[in-house]
Structure formats: structure tokens, C-alpha cells
Amino acid sequence: MPKLINYPHLASMAFGQPLYATQDVLAGVKSLLLPRMLGNHRDIMAADELPDGFEPAPLEAKGEFKNRIGGLAVIPVHGILMARRGHIDTTCTELTSYEWVRMQIATALADERVKEIVLDINSGGGMAVGCKELAEYIYSKRSVKPITALVNFAAYSAAYFIAAACTKVVVSETGGCGSVGVIMEHMEVSKWEQEVGLTFTTFYRGERKKDGTPHEPLSEGAMAAIDHRMDQAYNLFVSSVARYRGLPAEQVQATEAALFSGSEAVANGLADELANPQDYLNALAASVANQGKPQQSVGFRAKAIELQNQL
């Protein structure tokens, strides 16, 4: 039976939470949520076309990599980044969870056929929750096998948090990196509730329990608490990128969450190399192939082209 998207659940992740996301990502989520939450949009119930918890799965039945070019494992990191898997509807944008990416990396690390790992990144970011944990996992494993962040073509905010933790960051000239910052929006609907005749009475214990409620304007205490959470999330992002990239924290903070083109990202120390994603993947596949059986390198390059066209 078809199921509607759980919009209240999505709203709880989009509003009142620190996000490592660009303004465009947040605007896109709001354009999906707000009309539906206010009853101004009718959904096409097509959620049954995709199974619960659906995500792209480059795993073979026996736990080995499907998206593999010889000794090279390619893991897509696309769309809005979330902490855990959830329902996906055909009206939604592409979603990828941190736990799913970690699972793919773990599988690639355990696969003896895989010599190097590539994260194929095209994302404007997403949730702050879970992002640091994935980045730390990547950072701790890059000494086991090289992990390259191939920015194809965007690695902003949470996506850049992940990319920075990799062994190497490669970006195209027309691609971009950055947005090292945090954003949060609070949705207050008390005036709308008055207009439609809704009244909510909240019973609670603990003075801070209803901080951030959408049914009334933010109190000074609630705003102070939000500012504290934002400072924590921002400082964590800045200090982590500085450690991963070997940069002074002041230099990372001085970017002021700007979005940089490929060449600007390299110049500012956020990326290591400027390259066409297709060409880089082909060359890396050939290099990995040459470490084992040089005569197969042409075949691996052809496989790289085929795989890249699927990403």
C-alpha cells in the first residue's frame, strides 16, 4: 500500500537543528516541506515504488564491491546527507546517509581486491548529526588504504567535512568546495495558528523543555541556547577541517563559509589537485591496474568510463 512521506519527521531534521548545508539545500528542503505541511500541496502517493530504507547499494550478494574498477572501489556520496536511512519517495531529492557511506567504506577496506577507495562526491551537505563520526572514521582509515575525495562536482558543507578527512581532495575547475559553516532555521507558526483557529496548550517540566517550540516566539533563553549549539557545531567543523588538512584553524575560519571554485579551493588549501573527474578516475584506475597486471590497464580504463557514466 502506498505511503506518504513522513513530513513531520523530515521537518524535525530540517528545522531547529544545526545543519552543515548550503542555503540552496535548505531552500530546496523548505520548498518541499512547507507547502505540504500547510496543506497547500497534494502528494502523488508513489512511495511504494521504492522500498523502505532504499539507498543505492554497490554491494554484491557476498558483500564484495560491485562499483569496482579492478582494485579501485568507487562510492557515491550524492544529494542531501543524512545521519541514518529512512523512507525515500519519488518526489524527493537524492539522499545518502552517513551510516551507508561508512558501511561501503568498511566493505571496501575488507575486500582484498580493493587497493584504493574513491568517494564520488556531489552534494551541498546536510545534517550535522553523524557527519563528524563518519569523517573521523575516514580519517582513521586512510592509512589502511588511500581514500580520495573526487569532487564531481560539488563538496559543500557536510560533503566537504567528509572530503577533507580523505587522503586527497581532487576537484574540477568548474566544481567547488567549501561552505565550512553551520546554519539553522527556526520555524515559528503562532500567527498562522491564530489565523486558522488552532490553540496548543503545552504541559512540561523543566524550564528548558519547550525551548524552540514553534507555537510561540523564541525566548531569550532559547536563543542563547541555540547560539551555544551553533558555536559548538561551528567550532567542531572548523577545528576538524584544520586538523584533517593541516591548516591553521584561523585560516579555515577566515573562509567565512564561502563557496570556492575548484582553483580557489586549491589556492586556499581546501583541495589538493585540479582535474577533470572523468580523466582523473581513468588515470587512477590505470595506475592501480598497473600495480598488478599492466596488460589489463586498457580494459580498466574502459570500465572506468562505463562506471563514471553511471555516477
For each of these PLM feature ranges, what is it?
Residues M1-L311:
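N-terminal organellar transit peptides
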